[in-house]
């Protein structure tokens, strides 16, 4: 049975990757269908009730700069906002918001249901229709076939998902949802390497049974940050506090006593879990010398009593979970509302993807999110946007696009995955980006919004706001460079008391702002120097561009140098054994990863700059050095 309409792009799955993929394709004008097993769970936050953080917040800002929904939904759902690393340099500052699950889901669903060119249909997908290594459609659980030349799979943890609580396990996509068994089996027939990964979630606690007076209160920032470049504090709902408590030796003894019934430590779970979000069992085992571990007590929303205890993800049996929770200060009488669990699921080796996130094996088939071995809402959303966008470009007969590593964290993410692959759930950190001084949260729109507009991702409202901001930054920088203070100027009366060293020669306003003791707000508050910019985002940009100009230029020079060979192609039939001077280790790694370009080769672990130089000399001698058009 065939559906009565054809589509340009079909997106399978309605989580963070799927929603961004469907919205991106639809914004670009493609007739798009979003298939989900349950419309009510579109935009569901399956694990922690938070968006953003170190590295992750950078991705959210990039999604936003390209017209995505995640930041906007967070502004409408965020019940606590904080800027992390606020005392450090701008490259590593990151916005994090505690989110009300229900409000977030409602906002995402509202955006989806009001997006032109987008249809939503509730049915699980069981099969792909492939002809001559090209996807042409999908078949749902009830045998209904939908046709489209581009399919984006965003299956999350549903592919052959298996939930573990103690020694008990059962099939599931997440708690309360069925797994995608038939689709997983179909995908295993394709010529794409497959593996198993694992993630987990903590038990949820009834807030009425917690003694918050025994814990440390953690309030949000004042003034409140916003997540979206076009967001406003007035969109935020009521703000609440989080709390901090700790495990103790009694907690650790309870956990150790239950390890014989842990699916992780008894060999029941095969999948590898996230290194940077370990279960409490892993923490006790890996950091045996630590007497306590921090736990963040996070509200799940304004209309629920459920609490998310961030830091005690576990798959231990329920009785052990209850005992370990009640051993923690402030939770002596706590009641568990939902047990913690681990979930194993299929993922596919992202080295079998192009950087457009299209599979190399099947034309028109795109993967995004946890199916590619990543973990996290933000990583999923960023991939979803890229996959949906490239699916739309393919249907339009246009060239695929992916930002470079020096252009976006999204570029770092995709390049890491498609070049290096992953054996454990991959999450983003600022440390993964070698050019992080240029890839800041604050300038994501300046880096990407113009490209987003060119691609058709950015609407008029966002574009007009961006143009106004960009012009105000440029005009203010011109003003600061063109206005000067002289040693005999009347302005020195208000200026010199604010300086560590008084003015002895003429200086531009830009020179004054560059001084370590001066900031933009202080300079603009002095009589004769203002009034300055009212837009705080633009003012921040002016200050950063002035104060860090030397470092920014140095990093740009490094990028220009690397880019000269970044896109130099490596011939598909290149025999690395024939390249004189390469070590056996380097040859093995190059043969294993099969990089497409010199840039990709340079980022393979163990490939030294010397090896890249040898490779370039060999290619040049053979007349094989050519670049991507």
Swiss-Prot record:
NAD(+) binds at residues 273-287. It is found in: Cytoplasm. One of its GO terms (cellular component) is cytosol. The keyword Cytoplasm applies. FAD binds at residues 13-18. GO terms for biological process: tRNA methylation; tRNA wobble uridine modification. NAD-binding protein involved in the addition of a carboxymethylaminomethyl (cmnm) group at the wobble position (U34) of certain tRNAs, forming tRNA-cmnm(5)s(2)U34. One of its GO terms (molecular function) is flavin adenine dinucleotide binding. InterPro entries: FAD/NAD-bd_sf, GIDA_C_N, MnmG, MnmG-rel, MnmG-rel_CS, MnmG_C, MnmG_C_subdom, MnmG_C_subdom_sf. It comes from Shewanella frigidimarina (strain NCIMB 400). Its cofactor is FAD. Homodimer. Heterotetramer of two MnmE and two MnmG subunits. It comes from the Bacteria. Keywords: Cytoplasm, FAD, Flavoprotein, NAD, tRNA processing. Belongs to the MnmG family. This is tRNA uridine 5-carboxymethylaminomethyl modification enzyme MnmG.
């Amino acid at each position: 049975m065939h559906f009565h309409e054809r589509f340009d792009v079909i997106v399978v799955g309605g989580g963070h990757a799927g929603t961004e993929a469907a919205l991106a394709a639809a914004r670009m004008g493609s007739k798009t269908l979003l298939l989900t097993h349950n419309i009510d769970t579109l935009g569901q936050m399956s694990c922690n009730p938070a968006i953003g953080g170190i590295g992750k917040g950078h991705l959210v800002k990039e999604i936003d700069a390209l017209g995505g929904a995640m930041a906007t939904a967070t502004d409408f759902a965020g019940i606590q906002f904080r800027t992390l690393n606020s005392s450090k340099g701008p490259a590593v500052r990151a916005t994090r918001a505690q989110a009300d699950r229900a409000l977030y889901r409602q906002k995402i669903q509202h955006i989806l249901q009001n997006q032109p060119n987008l249809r939503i249909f509730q049915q699980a997908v069981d099969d792909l229709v492939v002809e001559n290594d090209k996807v042409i459609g999908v078949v749902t659980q009830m045998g209904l076939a939908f046709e489209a030349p581009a399919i984006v799979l965003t299956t999350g943890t549903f592919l052959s998902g298996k939930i573990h609580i103690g020694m008990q396990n059962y099939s599931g996509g997440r708690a309360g949802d069925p797994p995608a068994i038939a689709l997983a089996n179909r995908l295993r027939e394709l010529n794409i390497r497959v593996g198993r990964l694992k993630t987990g979630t903590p038990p949820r606690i009834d807030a009425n049974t917690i003694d918050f007076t025994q814990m440390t209160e953690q309030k949000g920032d004042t003034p409140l940050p916003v997540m979206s470049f076009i967001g406003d504090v007035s969109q935020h709902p009521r703000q609440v506090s989080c709390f901090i408590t700790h495990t103790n030796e009694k907690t650790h003894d309870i956990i150790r006593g239950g390890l014989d019934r842990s699916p992780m430590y008894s060999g029941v779970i095969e999948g590898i879990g996230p290194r940077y979000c370990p279960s409490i069992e892993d923490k006790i085992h890996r950091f045996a010398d630590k007497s306590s571990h921090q736990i963040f007590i996070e509200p799940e929303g304004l209309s629920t009593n459920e609490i998310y205890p961030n830091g005690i993800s576990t798959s231990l049996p329920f009785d052990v979970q209850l005992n370990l929770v009640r051993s923690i200060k402030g939770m002596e009488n706590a009641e568990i509302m939902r047990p913690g669990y681990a979930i194993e699921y299929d993922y596919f080796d992202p080295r079998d993807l192009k950087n457009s996130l299209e599979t190399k094996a099947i034309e028109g088939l795109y993967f995004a999110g946890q199916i590619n071995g990543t973990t996290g809402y933000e990583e999923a959303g960023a991939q979803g946007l890229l996959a949906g966008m490239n699916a739309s470009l393919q249907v339009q007969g246009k060239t695929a696009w992916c930002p470079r590593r020096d252009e976006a964290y999204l570029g770092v993410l995709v390049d890491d995955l498609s070049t290096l692959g992953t054996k454990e759930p991959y999450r983003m950190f600022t440390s993964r980006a070698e050019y992080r001084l240029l890839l800041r949260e604050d300038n994501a729109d300046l880096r990407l919004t113009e490209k987003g507009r060119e691609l058709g991702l950015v609407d008029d409202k966002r574009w007009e706001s961006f143009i106004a901001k960009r012009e105000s930054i440029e005009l203010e920088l011109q003003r600061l460079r063109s206005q000067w203070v002289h040693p005999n100027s009347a302005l020195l009366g208000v200026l010199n008391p604010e300086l560590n060293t008084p003015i002895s020669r003429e200086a531009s306003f830009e020179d004054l702002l560059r001084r370590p003791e001066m900031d933009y707000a202080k300079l603009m508050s002095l009589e004769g120097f203002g009034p300055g910019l009212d837009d705080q985002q633009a003012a921040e940009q002016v200050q950063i561009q002035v104060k860090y100009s030397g470092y920014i230029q140095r990093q740009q020079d490094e990028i220009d140098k690397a880019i000269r060979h970044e896109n130099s192609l490596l011939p598909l039939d290149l025999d690395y054994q024939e390249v004189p001077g390469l070590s056996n280790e380097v040859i093995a790694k190059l043969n294993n990863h099969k990089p497409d370009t010199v840039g990709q080769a340079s980022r393979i672990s163990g490939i030294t700059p010397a090896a890249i130089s040898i490779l370039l000399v060999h290619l040049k001698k053979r007349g094989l050095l050519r670049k991507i058009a």
